[in-house]
């Protein structure tokens, strides 16, 4: 009869380290941001009265480089939160839909044009508020990168 308590004690000792691996039910289902595919993202902003031409390239690990029209380069690293958000936006199915949408030509003078390359998907828009609303997913990436890279 002594073997039953010993076996129970042994089983408890073996399973205790695994208790930390159990899900609590409070965690969201599905892949987290780290599980999303990491792709290179390139944003080009051009136009405006001064003839701006800036290109931001973000590597899959969040390192970025920004080059202006004169060739001056700056670099940095996205925060973990910004990188997670960028990965979520890069996986957004709206980007593919926005890439195939037909956009009428704009009549705005001196407006900024944005061209976004996310992996193999290219989207673009002209920031001309009275004529058109920017595509939502593309605009979200543009806003994120503009804020994060200065």
What does each of the following model-derived ranges do?
Residues 71-75, 87-89, 118, 146-149:
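Short C-terminal domain-edge/linker segments immediately following a structured domain
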Residues 28-83:
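Extracytoplasmic low-complexity, Pro/Thr/Ser/Ala/Gly-rich segments
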Residues 15-18:
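Bacterial Sec-type N-terminal signal peptides, specifically the leucine/valine-rich hydrophobic h-region
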Residues 2-11, 21-46, 100-150:
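Short, well-ordered, aromatic-rich surface patches in folded extracellular/luminal domains
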Residues 60-62, 68-70, 90, 120, ...:
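A mature extracytoplasmic/lumenal domain signature
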Residues 73-102:
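Mature extracytoplasmic domains of secretory-pathway proteins
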